[in-house]
Amino acid sequence: QSIQSLYYAGNNADPRFDISKNYLGEWSKQQLYKNLTEYGNLVLLSDGEAHPLVCMEALSAGLGVVVTEWGAANLDSTKDFITIIPESKVSDIAYVQSQIINNRSYSVEHRQEIIEYSKQFDWVNVIKDVYIPIVEKIVSESK
């Protein structure tokens, strides 16, 4: 919470979290739709989510994402709007802050590129490109 340019929105179940610093509260869907694109990126430094849906939502809104290694499953780490913080660096506030700033600088200028990338996570594409081929392979192997 010591990064001044970082704002927090969402559920807060941790009593150690200081809600007096940059905490925006839990947003309703209406607030989310209205405000999300006012930000440059989403930062999720979590060790409990492998494929966080909030990242897909952020990408579809044109926001870059900054995640830990744990939250990077299925993300293309070669994209400049996807920043992966190594576990060994999560506690290095200066490093994390610099990565957030670099990601934000790129992301605000490349929203359309980010939105295009996010389309691969659309359910229509996931079903067509992932699920149907898997089912077809299972069916063909069982013959």
Predicted regions and their residues:
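Aromatic "clamp/platform" in nucleotide-sugar-dependent glycosyltransferases that forms part
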Residues: 47
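Short hydrophobic beta-strand element within catalytic cores of glycosyltransferases
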Residues: 64-68
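Glycosyltransferase donor-sugar binding loop
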Residues: 1-17
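Conserved active-site histidine-acidic residue motif and adjacent donor-binding/catalytic loop
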Residues: 11-14, 20-36, 88
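A short alpha->beta transition loop at the rim of the catalytic pocket in nucleotide-sugar-dependent
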Residues: 40, 62
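Conserved acidic donor-binding segment of nucleotide-sugar-dependent glycosyltransferases
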Residues: 79-91, 99-104
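Short alpha-helical segment that forms part of, or immediately flanks, the ligand-binding pocket
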Residues: 33, 56-60, 74-75
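A charged, aromatic-enriched C-terminal amphipathic alpha-helix characteristic of glycosyltransferases
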Residues: 88, 104-140
